[in-house]
Amino acid sequence: MRRAKIVCTMGPAVESAEKVKELIDAGMNMARLNLSHGGYEEHQSRLDRVREAAKAAGKPIAILVDLQGPKIRLARFANGPHELERGDIFTITTDEVEGTKDRVGTTYKGLPGDCKPGDRILIDDGKVTVEVVEVKGNDVVTKVIQPGAVSNSKGINLPGVAVSVPALSEKDKEDLRWGMKAGADFIALSFVRNAADNKDVHVIMDEVGFRIPVIAKIEKPQALDNLEEIVAAFDGIMVARGDLGVEMPIEEVPLVQKRCIELAREAAKPVIVATQMLDSMITNSSPTRAEATDCANAVLDGADALMLSGETSVGAFAIEAVATMARIIARTEEGGFEMIRALRTTPKKKGGAITRAAAEVGAIVGAKYLVTFTQSGDSARRMARLRSPIPIVAFTPEVGTYNRLALSWGVEPEVTPMVKHTDEMVKQADTLLIESGRAHVGENVVIVAGSPPGIPGSTNAMRVHVVGDAVGGVVAAYR
């Protein structure tokens, strides 16, 4: 059984209902809608196809709406791409202009105020580097240091410069409203710098009338200075290694990845590792050895999920990429499970203490499953962060929780009707474990629940249960 989950970015390469089904069959657990590209009608169609395919497959698939964020970009060129040579003078302006090889506009009107001579500007994830020569009015005049091609809407990074952009652009606000109304399970906020960025998201959510979990994308050096506060304020994090590797020395990224994963696990928040996981599979049917090792190391670091971007959205081998990643994860877990480091912190809350005790008791009694009943998913996430070798099944009456737990490491979610007593919960567990073939009569499971049922965050009970006792009426309370 594979524990770490797979996030797939939707796009033209997997547009049909048949392709979505193949993604799920290959191992997709979450579908990402990247709102940097495409319109609402296009994304709604993709979301609907994922929901339909998930229902047909009988599997939980989470939907992540990824906001573009205040990404600084070049504007559009009259034609192109244009090849910039070393030493060329290239001007980036806030004026509305039709781009040429020598001068182009930008989406960020504050660029001249944030730049000074000597600053380096990286274009298209660092493929092209220019150095600021002078700032004249609305123009930032630069000299090409690292040559390469420039084209429409390529991203701009300013390493070491604290740009004065808001957490949410006007586009992001509209995209957030759309994503919530469309039925997203998670929102991803780009270029998070501090914990306060989440407040802007919650203002919009409160206007809509409800909240859903928000994942902070860690891709700016400023975020690393506030990482613990960000993890505490958000509902999960994504290690977005693309911009992160452009904004800071590349040799720092592996250690940042490990730190992000460790802090998220300690807080029982899901953590996704993203960018260039199997990048060569956009055009090749098999990955490089380095990519396979990268995926394996993310698993051994303890990540909840690994994300595919262009590999599935525009790649020529989208299904193969998912299947390959699933095999790498499964084999890594099979042969290297003990290398996943145990948490170095002790639980600080009742729910954490009970789930940790359940995992320890489960190991002692040889439990077939760790079972949790959950409204919000909190107890399942607390169980998941322990990275126990015993599989976890989470029963919930909430469809939203069922879908969201598809992202959490090792959790197999199931939807069950709401009941009023813990004995009824145990009977539900008995029935579903036996009917699904997960466990057989006479095997032990450890059950974690809240009593009385139905109160989020009320985990306060643990019991060792012998499968079959409830449906067989062995104990008087079950008769």
What are these regions (language model features)?
Residues M1-R479:
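Non-catalytic helical/linker scaffolds that mediate oligomerization, partner binding
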